[in-house]
Amino acid sequence: EAGETVEKFCEEFKIPFGETQAGKSACKSSHPYCLGGIGVTGTYASNVIAKDADVVIAIGSRMSDFTTSSKRLYQHEGVKFVTINNCRYHAYKMDAVKAVGDAKATVTALAAKLRAKGYASAYTDEIAKAKAVWDEEMKRLAGIEYTGDDFEPIIKARDPRTVPEFVKLTDGKITQTAALAAIRRCIDADANIITAGGSLPSCMQRVWTTDKR
């Protein structure tokens, strides 16, 4: 329920935001400050901006190894963390300045404090550039096609027998990222989607978009 409040907060103070697996759809994917999934299974846009951030506000996040890339994602020498969480245990992670409470109420209170100080982030065109790079990558991923013996999967470290064997057994030749892009185009905008294990959840965090909360 805090998604719209978070969006307005980011708009007012020019703060970009990334999404965790659990947080996807809380905010609109089309929002100009949304960078998509963050962390090990995240997007280029989210991770390149997070890498140099000097302050990270984690709203409702457990700050897991996937989200933080085992604490290696945020590489600014003086990076500080602010956590907003209704679970005290998670709020205390990353040696953060912590607020234990409701996300919507806490973000609203934080906005009032920043507004009083006349705060705005120092970003200029970094956000737009990062999003543009990722948009091109999304198009590439959606267009990957199986071309036969000369096909080169995205993942290079693999058993070379796997893809030919899969095609032989199933006659399936659509790639996972292309399939997700096709499903996104075809299903209802407000449909709920459930994924299994393996590489699918990571692809979903990267390439799945939705504006329905």
Task: Enumerate the language-model features and the residues they cover.
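Active-site diphosphate/adenylate-binding microenvironment
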Residues: 135-213
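Conserved catalytic alpha/beta core of Sir2/sirtuin-type deacylases, generalized to analogous enzyme cores
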Residues: 4-13, 45, 104, 108-112, ...
